[in-house]
Amino acid sequence: NSLYHNNDEYWMNFIKFSKHMTLSRAVRCLTIMGRTEKDQLSLSQYLYPSMQAVDIKELDLDIVHAGTDQRKVHMLVREVFPKMKWKVPVAVHHHLIPGLANTGGASDTTFTKMSKSNPKNSIFIHDSEEEISSKIKIAWCPEGISDNNPILEYCKYLMFHDSDSFTIERPSKFGGDMLFSTYEELESEYKNGKIHPLDLKLSVGRELNDIISPIRAYFSNKSELFSSI
């Protein structure tokens, strides 16, 4: 990466920025790597918050847009950059959509977010309809459990984001379709065992494909744009 290789200015800025940090502050920022203060960390991992901060400087960013797991390092940036007379970026954070695998009871999505290093645990904008369906079908979605349930998270933050209703399609022999006008209503019915996980998954898979389909089509014949992201 040209940002780091043969770039003396970058590493000089790295040292300057690090002088404004304490070790305890660096540890608190390490959740951006999916780590906690309780984990045994290598020395190199303690360097990461400073590197991410200096990346913002080197890329001359006006806005940093990321998940809520990165808010600590971005708050550090907004605190330290003025002292160094560097341009202070606007920080915009959003809810993290969790990965599709079993979270093991983890309550912090920092540890369960989607990652490109595990394709089966993630939905990508270039996934085909078949890939989306396959991933959703094997996703962790315990019957009657809403906590840390990735399929219900999709419903809450994606299905209901741009729509005021969500339909679960079911064969008439299993009670027919179910229409929900709020996420809370859907969650309640699921927790009460009124919705089978497979019915929920199939409907979420269809909705996800509808969301991703135009994006997938746009990039299908623009490989140079796709490779850039």
What are these regions (language model features)?
Residues 1-93:
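Divalent-metal (Mg2+/Mn2+/Ca2+)-assisted nucleotide/phosphate chemistry catalytic cores
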Residues 53, 59, 71-229:
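Conserved nucleotide- and phosphate/pyrophosphate-binding catalytic cores
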